[in-house]
Amino acid sequence: MMPVILLLLLSLAIRCADGKAVQGDSDPSASLLTGDKNHDLPVKRDCTTCAGEECCGRCTCPWGDNCSCIEWGK
């Protein structure tokens, strides 16, 4: 009976490793194991000119020439 319990504990230790994947560590190997993706990576979007400045979002012009840039995600 004791060898069966030891085998179960060993299999859990191998699956959980040091617990980093369970705790959400930012280690790349942990993210591969859990399937997590980092959503904080900067993404280069197509930028345009809005009111004479570079705008990487939505350019709104409610009153003709009074344009403003609203960045994506804000």
From Swiss-Prot:
| Cell compartment(s), UniProt | Secreted
Keyword Disulfide bond part of the UniProt annotation: yes
> Where Tryptophan amide occurs along the chain?
W72
* Leader peptide range in chain numbering: 1-19
Q: Which GO terms describe its molecular function?
A: toxin activity
**What domain of life is recorded for the organism?**
Eukaryota
Q: Which residues form the propeptide?
A: 20-43
Q: How is it modified after translation?
A: Contains four disulfide bonds.
Task: Provide one Gene Ontology cellular component.
Answer: extracellular region
Tell me where it mainly resides.
secreted
Assigned keywords, A-Z: Amidation, Cleavage on pair of basic residues, Disulfide bond, Secreted, Signal, Toxin
- Tissues expressed in: Expressed by the venom duct.
| Key word Lipid metabolism present | no
UniProt domain comment? The cysteine framework is XV (C-C-CC-C-C-C-C).
What is the similarity comment for this entry?
Answer: Belongs to the conotoxin V superfamily.
Protein name per UniProt: Conotoxin Vi15a
Q: Which organism is it from?
A: Conus virgo (Virgin cone)
